[in-house]
């Protein structure tokens, strides 16, 4: 009998772990049907964007910039190219060309930013995952959002930064010099450090995370992949994103959505269209649609909190979180 219960315990633990990881990523694009997000449209964009390396200063970098700008104009957005010379430390600098598109909201409250970078890493990488996946997630996500004839309450700014790969220079140019920064309430940043696997939510905040976690769960992502241990480790790592610049230099809260599977593709010639996992792109699509629908209509003026939450993924229920000694389960 003792052996039976030991076996049963191991089986339950094994099944729990399996279901936890299996539930982290969608296996079909059917989950996107309610949003009208087309993976095929996104992949069509990506074929063009990742056709050649497009590092800052390269010929194809200009092609990608113009392509994104034209797509924003075709959707009827207000558009802008922010040209700015930026230097980092004593000897790193370049002229950056950030692409900005705006959807006007119905109120004068804080705005929402959809963020990614459009430059690829040096001459070898095709930049399909890092961060072409972010570019196409935003382009197709906004098209799907607008197709519902939804008028957001908050202004929505699409910011495609330049020169991320050589020191987050485009993000610095935007945060230090653009007037839009003063009214930003939240940033959603789409990134990659590999070519597949689940996309994890990693926050950036200078304060406590209670309200941010609550609103993340209220957005009802279909496949939330997040836990506070991963967040704690992330904060100790030296790898910053564009979102880090917003937090450190402007005290703006935000969420990173990033995948790290097949990490050996990162910053190499293997970061190609063919290597990007389709299900990973579907996961990013689920995030942007759920987050966009939610955060475009809530008050973003105060996302600060008096509490820190401990949170983790949980089978079936999706996420479990705890505030001090009080436990809550949200599905």
Model-derived features: positions:
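Acidic, Ser/Thr-rich low-complexity intrinsically disordered segments
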Residues: 1-4, 8, 303-331
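Hydrophobic membrane-insertion alpha-helices, especially the h-region
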Residues: 4-20
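Soluble extramembrane regions of membrane proteins in the secretory/endomembrane system
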Residues: 25-320
